[in-house]
Amino acid sequence: ETTPADRSVQIEEGRQIFLKGCSSCHGLNAEGMQIAPALIGVGAASVDFQVGTGRMPMADMSTQAMRKDPIYNAEETAALAAYVASLAPGPAIPSESSLNYERDGSTAEGGELFRNNCAMCHNFAGQGGALTQGKYAPTLMGVEPKHIYEAMVTGPQSMPVFSDKTITPEEKLSI
């Protein structure tokens, strides 16, 4: 379990990574700039998803950024996420234990929820597809369950946020 002292060290490590690798676009205080959005209040889940998948958003939401290979390892990504989470509340990274999606009956339920909420953009097979105005929904093949869950709670790029009232946490796990 992480102690408050460990958490403080991780936040400071994240701040140092942020200042070196992120502040030129997001601002010294994560306030955002013309080229990149503010990060205050986006939460650790958003950072973990964006940095961990290489799907950084643009400040101008009418433009879709191309996916790039992630440049930070898991420890650095966790430190960045901890730093951004320390700035203001936002969606948290789901715990490994909460991502135990191997429940009885969850596969059928997840399939139905996927068809009703996700397939219109990501297509029936999860292969992704074209959207309007030159945007696209990425393939979900090979994406970690954690990142799919984080995308549902943070709404990256053109994707809507699926609040817990729209799709419950248990239903998100089924998807």
Model-derived features: where do they sit?
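Periplasmic/extracellular electron-transfer cofactor-ligation site
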Residues: 7-41, 49, 53-59, 86-94, ...
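Residue-level marker of regulatory loop/turn positions in helix-turn-helix DNA-binding domains and
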Residues: 14, 72, 102, 106
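Solvent-exposed, charged amphipathic helical/linker segments at domain boundaries
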Residues: 92-109
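Extracytoplasmic electron-transfer domains, predominantly the class I c-type cytochrome c fold
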Residues: 38-88, 125, 131-175
